[in-house]
């Protein structure tokens, strides 16, 4: 039996101006895995995330967290936000304290934890995100990548069960992208945190994500593991997305260069294995 930490049932959300942002969303998020939400700008990803942790309340439908409907009382929402943390795309929208230590400690202080527990959690969060050496530095003096890590640490200090990140790799150089994704996967594996990301960086999805949902105009139109989702090439392209670069290369080799592949490989490792197998078969025949 599948273990889902979040269940979304017929979720609709309307903004006050009449915009119908989410339209009958049904979605199950597996506990302890990395899930990607894909889709163009304006399809409802951010609205969905804000419904997940109670910033917004559904117009209709419901969300279950840990198999219980979300409690929208003040106490219930405060508890929910300790368990489901959001890291925004632009860390400058999330950092507001004078120093890194003060900023990271904010959530723990707000939880009214004992001082020694606050110090312990902050130290652990700083160490986990690799920014212990920055703890006394003013937040406005940090690089963009460092600010991203501080924002993650500020959520991590509350020891959430779910960590939601809106475009976690946006604005980072290639090394920064790799480092931040490895950090997230490390937290998922070692702490058991469920990771949910919205991203336009298609190439990271088959490398780091277990599950994928594709959205269009407020609806989920595809879901599955990366191979299942990217096998729907026509649908992917119709919603202004693309295949991962390796997947596109394998598609070209098959359709234009006579290579024979059973499946569409999406990573370098998968592609090497398939091409070597094909090469050996040709030479042996």
From Swiss-Prot:
NCBIfam families tied to this protein: cbiO, PRK13636.1
Keyword Membrane listed: yes
Location, primary (coarse class): membrane
Keywords, ordered alphabetically: ATP-binding, Cell membrane, Membrane, Nucleotide-binding, Translocase, Transport
The protein's assembly and partners: Forms a stable energy-coupling factor (ECF) transporter complex composed of 2 membrane-embedded substrate-binding proteins (S component), 2 ATP-binding proteins (A component) and 2 transmembrane proteins (T component).
Domain of life (superkingdom): Bacteria
Keyword Acyltransferase part of the UniProt annotation: no
Binding site for ATP: 39-46
Function according to Swiss-Prot or TrEMBL: ATP-binding (A) component of a common energy-coupling factor (ECF) ABC-transporter complex. Unlike classic ABC transporters this ECF transporter provides the energy necessary to transport a number of different substrates.
The protein's name: Energy-coupling factor transporter ATP-binding protein EcfA3
SMART domains in alphabetical order: AAA
Family stated for the protein in its record: Belongs to the ABC transporter superfamily. Energy-coupling factor EcfA family.
GO biological process, one term: cobalt ion transport
Membrane topology: Peripheral membrane protein
GO cellular component: ATP-binding cassette (ABC) transporter complex
Molecular function terms, GO-annotated: ATP binding; ATP hydrolysis activity; ATPase-coupled transmembrane transporter activity
EC number: 7.-.-.-
Compartments, record wording: Cell membrane
Gene3D superfamilies associated with the record: P-loop containing nucleotide triphosphate hydrolases (3.40.50.300)
ABC transporter domain mapped to chain residues: 6-242
